[in-house]
């Protein structure tokens, strides 16, 4: 009788690798925040916002608890809520759809472009040109940049703009990715 070979485990990710590589800096920043007593809106948060904005080439950045809150705040800032629909890609984290539902809007899932797994601009154009019956107006489009793979933003912006919809890029999984 042959013994079964032990299973081969292929590691998919090492979430701790980034921390280990930056351990001293991260631990020092956490210690400074804890020592200051300012866990929210303190110097460390302000420094992070300034550094992140500079890294992105933006004038400002606002730190929030998570990507869901960020998307919900942007949607609210655009006045999007009940009576509106928001298109996003079908291949995304639940957080993207949760943000749309948090503001009372209706999520509309757009199929992927098979090569990139990001929003298919042609599918978006088809839905915007011929929305399903009874769907509220699509007031915003949220393409999601996944795994460092940017969506076809220029084409999505043109398509959404032609239909009066704002574009909100969900970059929570692709900070620093380039088109």
Spans of features found by a protein language model:
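Extended hydrophobic secondary-structure segments
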Residues: 87-97, 107-125
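Active-site phosphate-binding strand-loop segment of PLP-dependent enzymes
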Residues: 115-179
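The start of beta-strands in P-loop NTPase/AAA+ ATPase cores
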Residues: 9, 78, 84, 106, ...
């Amino acid at each position: 009788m042959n013994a079964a070979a032990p299973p081969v485990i292929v590691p998919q990710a090492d979430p701790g690798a980034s921390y280990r590589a930056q351990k001293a800096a991260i631990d020092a920043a956490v210690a400074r925040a804890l020592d200051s007593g300012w866990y929210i809106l303190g110097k460390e948060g302000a420094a992070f916002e300034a550094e992140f904005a500079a890294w992105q080439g933006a004038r400002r950045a606002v730190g929030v608890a998570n990507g869901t809150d960020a998307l919900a705040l942007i949607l609210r800032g655009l006045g999007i809520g009940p009576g509106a629909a928001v298109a996003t890609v079908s291949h995304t984290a639940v957080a993207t759809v949760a943000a749309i539902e948090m503001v009372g809007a209706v999520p509309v899932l757009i199929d992927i472009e098979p090569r990139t797994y990001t929003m298919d601009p042609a599918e978006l154009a088809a839905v915007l040109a011929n929305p399903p019956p009874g769907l509220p107006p699509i007031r915003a489009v949220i393409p999601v940049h996944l795994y460092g793979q940017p969506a076809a933003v220029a084409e999505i912006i043109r398509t959404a703009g032609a239909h009066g919809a704002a574009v909100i890029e969900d970059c929570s999984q692709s900070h620093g990715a380039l088109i």
